[in-house]
């Protein structure tokens, strides 16, 4: 005669199956992954309740044979594994949906450049400045960008990442090309828009420069020079080789750890992997896969190494923000996000 535990298990299984079936029959209720997971757990619980010996092989593997509640614990372990599998599947679907939306935002924003494009390829150096509510800092940054670098003309592109202030108007008034995201999408998304614009305009070299005044535009030639001389395809500015006004020991320690990890995974010899002051040969951008709207540094660095770009770092200076507060969030959030993208890119 079935035990009370098996009877309770069967009743619970039937309840789960009923709930899952009703949810799966609803139309327009969003993702079906949660309901499908409940259904699988219910079917599994029903199977075990009717034929408990079916889980014995897994119970043996887990070392739970002979334990008083071994079979129940085994069922719980299987259920948790199914739930985690469904969770990762749902997260993957959400990530892919987010990437599709992000690509649409970037494409629509980059299309704005056609309104300002005249004649043939732009050539020269396109200085991409991602900006989110930096109307107060942009005038000083743009004023310091030289008109020529290493014998090449410079062009300024400000990517307004959905600012609520006058960032776009200020940038346009200072003579910069401006494209604007309709919503705040993240610095990585803004830079990807900049890369897309650079390819459409036919720029030779792309320089990325923060809008908060931390990067010294007078040092752009240090980044561009090695590419012009065909010594590198991708040049990274390094505060380790240069100077920094940072007063955060925790952040500095984290950068050191992640620099070692990136070099280990990518086979590079970079001394600063968290600096956004960089230059890259525009013709090589299409060889790197970009998917991250945030914490884009590891994706770019590992992608460049995987694509076989010649990577070089040069000394630069990191200054304090001219005004306002950093948009990068806390050190912990930044560190966790950086690690997540680094591992995700390496495993891709």
Positions of PLM-derived features:
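A conserved acidic beta->alpha catalytic loop
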Residues: 160-168, 213
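Cell-envelope/extracellular polymer assembly enzymes that use nucleotide-activated donors
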Residues: 124-126, 155, 299
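Acceptor/aglycone-binding surface of glycosyltransferases and processive sugar-polymer synthases
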Residues: 177-200, 205, 217-294, 320-330, ...
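Donor nucleotide-sugar binding loop of glycosyltransferases
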Residues: 134-137, 163, 216
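Short, well-formed alpha-helical segments that are part of the catalytic scaffolds
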Residues: 134-148
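Hydrophobic helical membrane-anchoring modules
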Residues: 30-36, 47-60, 64-83, 90, ...
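Short beta-strand/loop segment that forms part of the nucleotide-sugar
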Residues: 129, 153-162
């Amino acid at each position: 005669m079935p035990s009370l535990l098996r009877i309770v298990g069967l009743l619970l299984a039937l309840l789960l199956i009923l709930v899952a079936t009703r949810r799966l029959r609803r139309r327009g209720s969003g993702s079906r992954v949660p309901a499908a997971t409940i259904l699988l757990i219910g079917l599994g619980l029903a199977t075990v309740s009717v034929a408990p010996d079916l889980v014995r092989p897994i119970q043996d593997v887990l070392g739970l044979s002979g334990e008083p509640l071994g079979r129940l614990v085994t069922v719980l372990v299987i259920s948790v594994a199914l739930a985690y599998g469904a969770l990762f599947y749902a997260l993957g679907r959400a990530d892919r949906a987010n990437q599709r939306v992000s690509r649409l935002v970037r494409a629509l924003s980059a299309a704005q450049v056609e309104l300002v494009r005249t004649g043939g390829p732009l050539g020269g150096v396109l200085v991409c400045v991602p900006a989110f509510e930096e109307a107060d800092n942009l005038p000083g940054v743009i004023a310091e960008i030289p008109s020529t670098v290493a014998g090449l003309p410079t062009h300024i592109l400000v990517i307004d990442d959905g600012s609520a202030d006058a960032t776009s108007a200020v940038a346009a008034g200072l003579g910069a090309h401006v494209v604007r995201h309709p919503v705040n999408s993240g610095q990585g998304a803004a830079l990807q828009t900049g890369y897309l614009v650079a390819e459409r305009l036919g720029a030779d070299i792309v320089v990325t420069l923060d809008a908060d005044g931390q990067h010294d535009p007078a040092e752009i030639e240090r980044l561009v020079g090695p590419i012009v001389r065909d010594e590198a395809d991708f040049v990274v500015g390094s505060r380790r080789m240069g100077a920094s006004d940072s007063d955060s020991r925790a952040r500095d320690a984290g950068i050191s750890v992640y620099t070692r990890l990136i070099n280990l995974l990518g086979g590079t010899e970079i001394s600063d992997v968290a600096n956004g002051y960089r230059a890259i040969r525009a013709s090589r951008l299409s060889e790197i896969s970009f998917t991250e709207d945030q914490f884009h540094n590891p994706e770019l660095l590992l992608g460049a190494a995987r694509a076989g770009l010649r990577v070089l770092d040069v000394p630069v200076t990191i200054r304090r923000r001219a005004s306002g507060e950093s948009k990068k969030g806390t050190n912990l959030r930044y560190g966790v996000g950086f690690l997540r993208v680094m591992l995700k890119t390496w495993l891709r």
